[in-house]
């Protein structure tokens, strides 16, 4: 099994798809990497030569921020926003949607399960 930047790539997938298993690499960036390294995107991971694997590894490590480094950077950005107290930081702190989505209804993933509030007693 081919291993790049700490991730085992699936053996039977095309390289175009296999590279997307790395955090920070999507379909577009995957195609850019393969074009820059001169590797056919229809090639299966199991058919990669050791030389191609080394070329891919060197290119990714030299030009891209992926996996742990990228995760740390994203977390640092969120922490910074919380510390400076900007609107997005407040939304992160409160566990609410950050990008302007509605919250009167929906937003359950971000807000968590409903907390039932006792309603008014009916007057008779």
UniProtKB/Swiss-Prot annotation:
GO molecular function terms attached to this record: rRNA binding; structural constituent of ribosome; tRNA binding
First and last residue of the signal peptide: none
PROSITE patterns: RIBOSOMAL_S13_1, RIBOSOMAL_S13_2
GO biological process: translation
Gene Ontology cellular-component terms listed: cytosol; plasma membrane; small ribosomal subunit
Record keyword rRNA-binding present: yes
Keywords per UniProt: Ribonucleoprotein, Ribosomal protein, RNA-binding, rRNA-binding, tRNA-binding
Gene3D superfamilies for this protein: 1.10.8.50, 30s ribosomal protein s13, domain 2
Region (Disordered): 94-124
One of the Pfam families matching this protein, by short name: Ribosomal_S13
Subunit and interaction comment: Part of the 30S ribosomal subunit. Forms a loose heterodimer with protein S19. Forms two bridges to the 50S subunit in the 70S ribosome.
Role description: Located at the top of the head of the 30S subunit, it contacts several helices of the 16S rRNA. In the 70S ribosome it contacts the 23S rRNA (bridge B1a) and protein L5 of the 50S subunit (bridge B1b), connecting the 2 subunits; these bridges are implicated in subunit movement. Contacts the tRNAs in the A and P-sites.
Family affiliation: Belongs to the universal ribosomal protein uS13 family.
Record-linked PANTHER family: 30S RIBOSOMAL PROTEIN S13/40S RIBOSOMAL PROTEIN S18 (PTHR10871), SMALL RIBOSOMAL SUBUNIT PROTEIN US13M (PTHR10871:SF1)
HAMAP family: Ribosomal_uS13
Name the record gives this protein: Small ribosomal subunit protein uS13
Organism: Mycobacterium tuberculosis (strain ATCC 25618 / H37Rv)
Taxonomy of the source species: Bacteria, Bacillati, Actinomycetota, Actinomycetes, Mycobacteriales
């Amino acid at each position: 099994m081919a291993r790049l930047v700490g991730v085992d790539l699936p053996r039977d997938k095309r390289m175009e798809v296999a590279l997307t298993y790395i955090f920070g690499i999507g379909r577009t960036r995957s195609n850019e990497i393969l074009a820059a390294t001169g590797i056919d995107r229809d090639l299966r991971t199991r058919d990669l030569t050791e030389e191609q694997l080394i070329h891919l590894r060197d290119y990714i490590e030299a030009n891209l921020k992926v996996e742990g480094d990228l995760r740390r950077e994203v977390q640092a950005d969120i922490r910074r926003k919380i510390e400076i107290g900007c609107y997005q930081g407040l939304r992160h702190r409160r566990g609410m949607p950050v990008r302007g989505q509605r919250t009167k209804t929906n937003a359950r993933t971000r807000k968590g399960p409903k907390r039932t509030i006792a309603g008014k007693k009916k007057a008779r």
